[in-house]
A protein has these predicted regions:
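A short, small-residue-rich loop immediately preceding and capping a beta-strand
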Residues: 21-24, 51-53, 72-112, 272-280, ...
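Glycine-rich, anion-gripping cofactor-binding loops and their flanking helix/strand elements
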Residues: 71-72, 90, 222-301, 309-312, ...
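Glycine-rich, acidic loop regions that bind phosphate or pyrophosphate groups
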Residues: 109-159, 246-346, 450, 458, ...
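Phosphate/pyrophosphate-binding active-site segments
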Residues: 1-2, 291-388, 492-496, 507-535
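Conformationally flexible catalytic loops at phosphate/diphosphate-handling active centers
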Residues: 48-50, 155-158, 162-215
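N-terminal cofactor/phosphate-binding cores enriched in small/glycine residues
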Residues: 4-96
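Active-site diphosphate/adenylate-binding microenvironment
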Residues: 8-11, 16-19, 29-30, 34-38, ...
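Thiamine diphosphate
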Residues: 108, 113-128, 392-535
Length: 535
């Protein structure tokens, strides 16, 4: 029987399936349940995939013993399991050695519940990052919900992947455990499948990925934030090999599809992919992401060059570390047309787009886009501030015609205007910034720069507070919502414009827009031009 600690059983299952066959174990009470499970593996593992444990009393020696076992097995990952407190610190010499020699040493430490840290409890120290900078810590918190079980499994998977990533190295897995500890009535381990990991510097597609796509009925590519266009996506899309769903901030063609899916529950219901390939950075839309998380039979492949293991759609089963554009280009000749892709692509491209309820913000963006297209103004980029502005832009700038820049790495309101100012300083072309009032006043120091020129044009939507807060269910029930949470105010940007010698324009109704937009986009100016639109 295995122990009754869910996080320990998930860890045990992932270790067994990740190719770890040896563990060095040290004495201790808090890690006793982990050692029990590892011992059970020696009894229940198959003859084809045996599991061995090695008892060593001294933790400093034990970690080096594990290192030696790894060396003897052609750098196969080996675990060392220690109890809480100073026992973990004793592994540092071996961990440092493993770091500099790129030896995949997995240090598994039992830990006390986090609320006991700093309470003068025995063998209780802050163990997260205790082995830094030599080993990154992954924590397997005790899960109490289905979602927490999922993230616990992910942490164990990511730790095992980190052992092999970029030549290999040491990793720290910290396992907090509350009392009671010693109950062993679980007959079998959970079916916690590991995330398959492939690393390819030249973008050669793994055979397992080719098979996945070949077997899929409706393979979909969701493209998050990108800074430049990827032509390979259009080719795959035109050939109906993959259904490409780019986000607004991806700077790809066909972002109107994602905008449609965000706004239409009926279309989201019809989108039932069996394989999702996820590339690019952050996503703006929420509804499509939530719908895909609820698809029970969805398989997700993440392709990226950087470290980490984002499981945005909560169905990740393969991680490929590679330049995704190169990989998709090399995949293309290996794939065939998919009838389901063709059908859904046509449906999305022919579906009528529900124009948002006419407001001055949407009207202004539409008019500005029309003016830019008609007059072919040399434009470096359009910068979008976060919150309402970027969501409104999804209904207008979704055809990949313009280069869009958004601070979606963290999604904060700070720095939107500063990033646009930096772009304008480095370019001779026009930089256009759309921004809301809170973001503007928060970042107004971006304009405190005498080097800024007239190629920076700013459209400020002033609705006297954070409009996005009005769309949060239940928040309006709070008497603090308007003044204290949404940042309600009665401020105009006219004074800011005068202070920094900007040309100031304003519009208070749709009738004011045509002349104001025409001057904003055509007037020669030595300093930035600001159009404030009162919503």
């Amino acid at each position: 029987m295995f122990c009754d600690k869910t996080n320990v059983n998930i860890l045990t299952s992932i270790l067994l399936q990740s190719g770890i066959t040896d563990a060095v174990v040290c004495p201790g009470s808090r890690n006793g349940v982990i050692v029990h499970n590892l011992h059970e593996l020696t009894r229940t593992a198959s003859p084809e995939h045996p599991f061995r444990i090695h008892a060593v009393t001294d933790e400093r020696s034990a970690a080096f013993v594990a290192l030696g076992i790894s060396l003897a097995q052609d750098l196969r990952p080996v675990a060392v399991c220690v109890t809480s407190g100073s026992a973990l610190l004793n592994t540092i010499p071996a961990v440092a050695e493993a770091f500099y020699r790129q030896i995949p040493l997995l240090v598994i430490s039992a830990d006390r519940p986090p609320q006991l840290i700093g309470q003068l409890d025995g063998q209780t120290i802050p163990q997260t990052s205790a082995l830094a900078p030599y080993a990154k810590t992954y924590t397997l918190a005790e899960p109490h919900t289905e979602a927490e079980v999922h993230w616990c499994r992910n942490a164990a998977c990511e730790a095992c992947i980190a052992l092999k990533r970029r030549g290999g190295g040491p990793v720290h897995l910290n396992v907090p455990l509350s009392e009671p500890l010693f109950s062993f009535t679980t007959p079998r381990l959970p079916s916690a499948s590991p995330v398959a990991f492939y690393e390819t510097e030249d973008g050669a597609p793994p055979a397992a990925l080719v098979s996945k796509i070949s077997e899929a009925t409706l393979p979909v590519v969701i493209v998050g934030q990108c800074e430049r266009k990827a032509d390979i996506l259009e080719r795959l899309d035109e050939e109906n090999k993959l259904l490409v769903l780019p986000e607004l901030v991806s700077n790809q063609a066909n972002a109107h599809r994602t905008a449609l899916l965000e706004s239409s529950p009926e279309l989201r219901e019809q989108l039932r992919p069996d394989l999702l390939i996820h590339v690019g950075g952050n996503l703006v839309g929420k509804q499509l992401k939530l719908a895909l998380r609820q698809r029970p039979a969805l398989s997700v492949v993440r392709i990226q060059q950087n470290a980490g293991m984002p499981d945005t759609f909560m169905h990740l089963d393969m991680l490929v570390e590679a330049p995704w554009q190169n990989l998709l280009a090399r995949l293309r000749p290996l794939l065939r047309e998919k009838p389901a892709v063709c059908r859904l692509r046509q449906q999305l491209d022919n579906a009528p787009y529900a124009i948002p309820a006419a407001d001055i913000q949407h009207t202004a963006m539409t008019a500005i886009k029309r003016h830019l297209q008609q007059h072919r103004l040399p434009l470096s980029a359009i910068h979008l501030a976060n919150s309402t502005v970027v969501r409104s832009a999804a209904a207008v700038f979704n055809d990949g015609t313009f280069t869009l820049r958004v601070n979606r790495g963290v999604n904060g309101i700070e720095g939107s205007l500063s990033a646009a100012a930096g772009n304008a300083l480095a370019s001779r072309k026009t930089v256009l910034a759309f921004i809301g009032d809170l973001s503007f006043f928060y970042d107004q120091n971006a304009l405190w720069n005498s080097a800024l020129r007239g190629n920076l044009r700013i459209v400020l939507f002033n609705n006297s507070g954070g409009r996005i807060f009005k769309h949060l269910p239940g928040l309006n029930d709070s008497p603090a919502s308007n003044s204290y949470i949404a940042g309600a105010h009665h401020t105009s940007a006219r004074g800011v414009a005068e202070t920094h010698r900007l040309e100031y324009l304003s519009a208070g109704s749709p009738d004011d827009l045509p002349s104001a937009i025409n001057r904003l986009l055509t007037h020669e100016a030595e300093r930035p031009v600001l159009l404030e639109i009162f919503c």
